[in-house]
C-alpha cells in the first residue's frame, strides 16, 4: 500500500533529498581535492560529508528540520568562504551562495521570514567575499584545475537550483 504524501512526509522527502544531494556533492569534492592533492579542502570536504550524514540522521530520526536547515545554510557559507579564499573568486564557489539563496521556498521555521534572512546572509557573504578576495588567493592554480573547479561548481549549483525548482 503506497504511503500517503501529507505535508510532514513532503517536508521529510524534500530535506532528505537535499541533504543526500549535499552528501553527493561533498563526496565529489572530496574525490576531486584528493586527486588534485589539496589537503585542507580535502579534509574540509571529508568533514562535510560526515556533517551531512549527521544532518540526515537529524532529519530522519529526530525530525529537526529547522535546526538541520539552519546548520546547512551556515555550512554552505563556511564552504564557500574557505574555498574562495584558497582558490580565488574565479573558481566560482560563490555560485553555491546563489543556489542556496533560492531555498526560501522551503520553510521549516515558525516564522516565514527566517529563510529570507538566510538568503540575505548568503547575498551579503557573496558581496563581501567578492570585495575581499579580488586578486588574492593562497594558492595559484593551474588553468586546467581552475577550469575543472569552475565546471564542478557550476554543475553543483545548477543541480541544486534545478532540484529546488523541481520539487
PLM feature spans:
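Cytosolic juxtamembrane amphipathic/interface segments immediately preceding
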Residues: 2-8
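Hydrophobic alpha-helical transmembrane segments of multi-pass membrane proteins
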Residues: 8-65
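A generic helix-loop boundary/linker signal
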Residues: 14, 93-94, 158
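Physicochemical signature of membrane-embedded alpha-helices that form the seven-helix bundle of GPCRs
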Residues: 18-21, 44-47, 71, 114-115, ...
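Hydrophobic transmembrane alpha-helices
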Residues: 26, 52, 57-59, 69-95, ...
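Juxtamembrane or sensor-core-proximal signal-transducing alpha helices
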Residues: 152-167
Amino acid at each position: 500500500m503506497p504511503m500517503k504524501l501529507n505535508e510532514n512526509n513532503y517536508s521529510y522527502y524534500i530535506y532528505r533529498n537535499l541533504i543526500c544531494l549535499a552528501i553527493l556533492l561533498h563526496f565529489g569534492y572530496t574525490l576531486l581535492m584528493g586527486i588534485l592533492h589539496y589537503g585542507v579542502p580535502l579534509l574540509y570536504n571529508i568533514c562535510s560529508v560526515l556533517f551531512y550524514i549527521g544532518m540526515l540522521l537529524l532529519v530522519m530520526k529526530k525530525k529537526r528540520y529547522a535546526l538541520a536547515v539552519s546548520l546547512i545554510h551556515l555550512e554552505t557559507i563556511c564552504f564557500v568562504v574557505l574555498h574562495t579564499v584558497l582558490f580565488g573568486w574565479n573558481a566560482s564557489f560563490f555560485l553555491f551562495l546563489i543556489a542556496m539563496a533560492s531555498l526560501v521556498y522551503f520553510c521549516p521555521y515558525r516564522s516565514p521570514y527566517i529563510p529570507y534572512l538566510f538568503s540575505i546572509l548568503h547575498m551579503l557573504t557573496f558581496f563581501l567575499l567578492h570585495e575581499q578576495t579580488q586578486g588574492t588567493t593562497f594558492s595559484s592554480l593551474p588553468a586546467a584545475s581552475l577550469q575543472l573547479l569552475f565546471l564542478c561548481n557550476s554543475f553543483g549549483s545548477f543541480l541544486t537550483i534545478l532540484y529546488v525548482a523541481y520539487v
